[in-house]
């Protein structure tokens, strides 16, 4: 699977440790297979850095994929990942120093790597020292990297190393941003903030009239917007004009974003999936307006009691990915990642 390292370590009779490292190349597609999946682990604020998992189309798992390819680690409490132009941008909450001042040996707050080899291309830490617990990232190009934190959304020019807080972005929610029509869309209450290249002020706002839970790019280049409340709604919004194309009322679930920081809806063509951090997975067919409960993941593994962050659907295979943990305390170390197939009237487990 691409480029890696072979390590041989031994100890002599005097207790001295010897380590030999060889870089090796294995014929294959590396991490470029579009059927593969990356999963970002935040790690733990007090004990370990974040890490990246890669799962290939056969369900084989490579833990610590970034560390394997670089010999170094991602930042402390990694939060979000965005891939643009064969580059992977990974933002962490704490970078090299956690919230209580403990230092960590890692590559910093923002890491840029080749998305097909995972080889590190650039790292940033001091340049982003003004950020306060960053959580999400979206990228238009190297000079227009948008990072959401507790202050709002910042524009970062990685070529110049300059970060600027975007005026009018205060209150941007701890939720995934979407990129469509060459713009970034961030959530702030009932409004979408429209962020544009090179602009340090919010370009315009789109008022949906109801608390927004999630925004995601549709396969036709427009936007999916879910709204929580009673009734809950899902709308398709024109990414060029900001006008609603169609809005469906959803009565079966409330579409609440909950405590998850990811995108609470996930789309495959005109079908949208939602779990609400629970074990049941729902499908909303936007064309027909019908919502169906596909199944309960507890039927596959009852030992895992909590869904940790929202589900995600693979844009090519249509398979649904859900992460479940055994519980809090040290039980968070015991987890299962489910790969599921929508059979039309239920769920089929592909890999666990």
Stretches with model-predicted labels:
Residues 10-12:
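Conserved structural position at the C-terminal beta-strand
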Residues 36-40, 87-91, 144-147, 183-186, ...:
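Conserved beta-propeller blade signature
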Residues 71-83, 129-142, 170-182, 209-219, ...:
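Repeated scaffold domains used in trafficking and secretory/extracellular systems
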């Amino acid at each position: 699977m691409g480029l890696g390292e072979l390590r041989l370590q031994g100890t002599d009779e005097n207790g001295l440790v010897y380590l030999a490292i060889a870089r090796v190349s294995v014929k294959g597609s590396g991490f470029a297979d579009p059927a593969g999946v990356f999963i970002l682990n935040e790690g733990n604020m007090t004990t370990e850095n974040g890490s990246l998992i890669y799962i290939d189309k056969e369900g084989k798992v490579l833990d610590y994929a970034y560390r394997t390819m670089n010999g170094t680690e991602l930042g402390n409490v990694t939060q979000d990942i965005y891939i643009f132009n064969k580059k992977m941008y990974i933002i962490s909450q704490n970078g090299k120093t956690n919230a209580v001042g403990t230092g960590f040996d890692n590559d910093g707050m923002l890491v840029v790597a080749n998305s097909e080899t995972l080889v590190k291309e650039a790292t940033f830490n001091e340049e982003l020292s003004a950020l306060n617990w960053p959580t999400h990232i979206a990228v238009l190009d190297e000079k227009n990297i948008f990072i959401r934190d507790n202050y709002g959304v910042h524009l970062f020019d990685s070529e110049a190393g300059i970060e600027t807080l975007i005026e009018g972005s205060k209150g941007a929610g701890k939720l995934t941003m979407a990129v469509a029509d060459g713009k970034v869309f961030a959530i702030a209450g009932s409004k979408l903030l429209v962020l544009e290249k090179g602009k340090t002020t919010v370009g315009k706002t789109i008022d949906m009239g109801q608390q927004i839970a999630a925004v995601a790019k549709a396969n036709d280049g427009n936007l999916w917007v879910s709204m929580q409340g009673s009734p809950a709604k899902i709308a398709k919004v024109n990414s060029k004009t900001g006008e609603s194309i169609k809005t469906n009322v959803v009565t079966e679930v409330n579409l609440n974003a909950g405590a998850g920081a990811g995108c609470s809806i996930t789309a495959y063509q005109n079908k949208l999936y939602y779990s609400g951090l629970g074990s049941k997975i729902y499908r909303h067919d936007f064309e027909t307006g019908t919502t169906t409960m596909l199944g309960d993941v507890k039927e596959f593994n009852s030992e895992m009691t909590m869904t940790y962050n929202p589900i995600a659907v693979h844009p090519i295979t249509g398979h649904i990915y859900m992460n479940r943990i055994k519980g809090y305390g040290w039980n968070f170390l015991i987890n299962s990642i489910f790969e599921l197939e929508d059979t039309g009237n239920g769920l089929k487990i592909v890999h666990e």
